[in-house]
Amino acid sequence: MPVDDCWLYFPASRGRTFVQTVWVAPTCPNCCWFPGFLPPVPRPPHVPRVLLRGPRGAVLPASRPSKTLPSSSQTPCPTDPCICPPPSTPDSRQEKNTQSELPNKKGQLQKLPTMNGSKDPPGSYDFDLIIIGGGSGGLAAAKEAAKFDKKVLVLDFVTPTPLGTRWGLGGTCVNVGCIPKKLMHQAALLGQALKDSRNYGWKVEDTVKHDWEKMTESVQSHIGSLNWGYRVALREKKVVYENAYGRFIGPHRIVATNNKGKEKIYSAERFLIATGERPRYLGIPGDKEYCISSDDLFSLPYCPGKTLVVGASYVALECAGFLAGIGLDVTVMVRSILLRGFDQDMANKIGEHMEEHGIKFIRQFVPTKIEQIEAGTPGRLRVTAQSTNSEETIEGEFNTVLLAVGRDSCTRTIGLETVGVKINEKTGKIPVTDEEQTNVPYIYAIGDILEGKLELTPVAIQAGRLLAQRLYGGSNVKCDYDNVPTTVFTPLEYGCCGLSEEKAVEKFGEENIEVYHSFFWPLEWTVPSRDNNKCYAKIICNLKDDERVVGFHVLGPNAGEVTQGFAAALKCGLTKQQLDSTIGIHPVCAEIFTTLSVTKRSGGDILQSGCUG
């Protein structure tokens, strides 16, 4: 009689072979040889020689054997003498791996271990793939896996913020990240454009008011359409979606709990963790009671008024930028440096530009207490803060306090310890291989929760798609985490790709890099006569490698649009000579990169007198 379906590994096959039915053939007591299929393979202790029947009844390698194999049909081992080691005796087996260590009795079926220690054969799972997290990466992986006719389940559940904010399918980027942030950044740019328009002949009233409620209504309407579109796309691709919280309860098993507390248990051959991150709180009196995070800001039903932004991350500076851009009084409280992890030359220029445009900075202070002075929408709050390098304390009153001090991975409450997935105990990040595989072979992870990887939506999408193609499409293409472009949507946008100046010095040595740089003045800004010599371009070249460009940085309008094309060039090995030989498009901001000639080392003048230098 056949045993359960399982996976069996044969070293000589350079891969894995699916065993749908296993038949005992006790001819050679020492090896797993069967005619015409593989060379002799040493047999693990107490695992009998087998003949295999593949999927849909296909016999490996010849015709399907009968359930009782007569001795005349048994083929002796082709090696003479047999090269396989004798099996261990029952007394020598150890306590662990009990599924594979039953006594070997000739002519009797033995229980073989299935992949990853599960008692379930792959064919008996509810799904081929269960994805925990319905963000950009998880959805990309789900839709890609469905192309290969795999049965996929997506579990997505939003734990409400302390203020009760929640949202629909799509994850951080769509609901409380990239999409609403960029739209509100656009609202601020339009405010500046209205001011500039007077110099272009438009008659605009001196007082132009911004309507917060109208903006959030429009933004949330667009987000709602995206949420619906994702659900429709999953349904069309026959991906099962449940609004439920997923938690591992054992190997290949998960419990899904919906918002009413109803639980369902599902099993899958593989799992993908794509749970993302949530904003971090300070752990001080009043932070969760009275403060908001970026998870709350984009759907806030009232104008936040005078706002204190706590933090120096890109989230903090982007939010401070568009809030100031729509006319609000904004202060940023910074513990140490701006934009940690980014090029500090560029970060400081961003800070200077924001200060010149009315955003106040309180540096080297951290909040210690938040108190409510007056309830309301927005109400009034008192903030007490402590200096990071002295005993000085300060107080200030604000209508809204926005916390943007970092984000924590959503990995600590999904039962990873139950199945043995290792995480960084300090950060909650998950270490993975270059194929996004955790230390548990059937569990994978992508996105912001990965240790040492970029926390960017396009990275998660790319990793999710490529993972599904490798698992189900026979691909061997891996996600390339090098030279990934990104943009910080501050009032003066910052686009970059490759190494920061600090990282380049660390990697190659200061004497082995050359930095070419220049200020520039967008033509559109010359007529309203604003922000001359504030936009800035910089490339970092490796002198030991034909001046190959290893870092690209730009401050200016539409920085993301400028950076995207250069990112492709960097991946192709762009050199300074190739940039110099490229004819620029005139008059646009990006052409500055075709004319860079002054190096930082030289100390030459980089100020520009007009759009054409």
Swiss-Prot record:
Gene Ontology molecular function: any one: NADPH peroxidase activity
EC class: oxidoreductase
EC number(s) reported in the record: 1.8.1.9, 1.11.1.2
GO BP field: cell population proliferation; cell redox homeostasis; gastrulation; mesoderm formation
Protein's job: Reduces disulfideprotein thioredoxin (Trx) to its dithiol-containing form. Homodimeric flavoprotein involved in the regulation of cellular redox reactions, growth and differentiation. Contains a selenocysteine residue at the C-terminal active site that is essential for catalysis. Also has reductase activity on hydrogen peroxide (H2O2).
The protein's name in its UniProt record: Thioredoxin reductase 1, cytoplasmic
GO CC term, one of those recorded: cytoplasm
Superkingdom classification of source: Eukaryota
Region (Disordered): 58-121
Cross-link Cysteinyl-selenocysteine (Cys-Sec) mapped to chain: 611-612
Record's catalysed reaction(s): [thioredoxin]-dithiol + NADP(+) = [thioredoxin]-disulfide + NADPH + H(+); H2O2 + NADPH + H(+) = NADP(+) + 2 H2O
Further comment: The thioredoxin reductase active site is a redox-active disulfide bond. The selenocysteine residue is also essential for catalytic activity.
Cysteine-cysteine disulfides: 173-178
Subcellular location: Cytoplasm
Polar residues: compositionally biased ranges: 65-74
Subunit structure: Homodimer.
Pfam families: Pyr_redox_2 (PF07992), Pyr_redox_dim (PF02852)
Positions carrying Phosphotyrosine: 245
Modified residues (N6-succinyllysine): 182
Disulfide bond among keywords: yes
InterPro entries with a match to the protein in the record: FAD/NAD-bd_sf (IPR036188), FAD/NAD-binding_dom (IPR023753), FAD/NAD-linked_Rdtase_dimer_sf (IPR016156), GSHR/TRXR-like (IPR046952), Pyr_nucl-diS_OxRdtase_dimer (IPR004099), Pyr_OxRdtase_I_AS (IPR012999), Thioredoxin/glutathione_Rdtase (IPR006338)
Family membership: Belongs to the class-I pyridine nucleotide-disulfide oxidoreductase family.
Needed cofactors: FAD
Species of the source: Mus musculus (Mouse)
Modified how: ISGylated.
Active site: 586
Residues in coiled coil: none
